[in-house]
Amino acid sequence: MADFALARTPDDIRHAVAAAWPSILVVSNGAIDLSGRFAGRLLTVPPRYDYLGEGDVIAFDHTSRKFRTLYRRNSAHNSLLITERCNNYCMMCSQPPKNVDDRWILGEIKESLPLIDRETQALTFTGGETLSDWEDFIAVLTGCRDWIPATAIQVLTNGRAFANSRIVDAWKDISHPALMAAIPVYASVEYVHDHIVQAKGAFDETILGILKLKDRGQRVEIRVVLHALTAPFIEETGRWLARNLPFVDPSH
């Protein structure tokens, strides 16, 4: 983990060198000659990355010599992928689950939290199923509480993990003032929901998880994705949610 000076012009580079920055990231399509003047780390990326700005967080893969943008300070819509694994197999999913060991992502995010601007208004965690490695993810959320306490945190989850009281209690014990679980309920009847997520028993686990969260005073947002299988039942689903889950929370 390191801080980089961001440079776009020769003057930017000279100022960074004069200020003794140990690392410089240059957005340029030309050759950079700093021979004899700079002994630190110099990285150059082409102009298509001109969107990078002060306070952004990027992650480097030294093997592939590629980088990913994890966080953009000037964006109001920052989402961090937790995992590509999931125990639902939603028929309309734009990112089907992968059976891969990607637990390293959680470690990367934990290291990134101190770099995120404390004035960030909102941050979303998504997957895969964000609670696949729930203990490590709880540690990430605890880090959010400690490093960016004023930032509203939204977690996209299928909610099934919350059927486990141990997980719900760990979530509650974070005591984050603005933590929200965003959980989809695709239908008011079990077999339709389970068919859509391709997981028998998912509806019962999801509803039980929602009830346990609310029993512990936690914030829950309900989501319904409209498509060919859910749209015909949307009125019935809406009435069922209003009748049976009137205590859920409005979205951010």
Question: Predicted regions: what is each one?
Answer:
Residues 94-105, 118-133, 144-164, 175-207, ...:
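Core AdoMet radical
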Residues 140-144, 171, 210-214, 241:
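Hydrophobic positions in alpha-helices of CheY-like receiver
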Residues 164-170:
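Alpha-helical scaffolding within the catalytic cores
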Residues 54, 81, 85-88, 95-96, ...:
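A structural signal for the main folded, soluble domain(s) of proteins
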Residues 70-106:
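Canonical Radical SAM [4Fe-4S] cluster-binding loop centered on the CxxxCxxC motif
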Residues 1-76:
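Flexible, acidic/Gly-rich N-terminal and inter-domain linker regions that tether
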Residues 169, 228-244:
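Catalytic cores of alpha/beta
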Residues 170-174, 199-201, 239-241:
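Short, hinge-like loop/turn segments at secondary-structure boundaries
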